[in-house]
Amino acid sequence: MTSGNHIWDKKEVYEYINDSDCLVRPLNYPNCNWGSGYKIFEVQGVKIAVTNLLGRTFMAPVDSPFEALKNLAEEIKDKVDLIFVDFHAEATAEKVSFGYWAKDLGVHAVFGTHTHVQTADEKILDDKTAYITDAGFCGAFHSIIGMDVEASLKRWTTCIHDRLDVVDSPVAQFNGVKFKFNKITKCCEQVQRISFVKNFSEVI
């Protein structure tokens, strides 16, 4: 599981992440932070490195995600078969630029996150690297990026920033992306967006 700029919002994660074998914090946070900025998983004999980096445009100051990924790719490229990157960023131009940078470093897939809105620009860069600007989110369908509609509207119409709560609703949307790779060349052959809505109140 990758994370993002809210990774430290709950204090419970401080100790948990050190013992977790599946939770990744942003790689370009300071090294003194808890946890690790990448993990290596083996799936059906294929070693996959998964890392998470934060963008810097309209975000809190962090180390360069470009340099952080370059250093990581050089360190692990001979140890794994595939490298997947979750780039948690706000600006589209920064995300697209990062995709091309990652492609030149030998990364196999880059999927953006953070905006909670799935984009329709899935592509394969130079017949090698899978890319999508934002994979979207999983959460309440009748919401404003997962948050309560009335509270969100109050923020926009009154400039009063009350607490925003996650909507508890039986109608949920599911976003994601699926990649298909060539077993021999390791190049991506297909990028497929996943998006559907399910009403759990109708489930018996």
Predicted regions and their residues:
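Acidic, metal/ion-coordinating pockets
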Residues: T2-I204
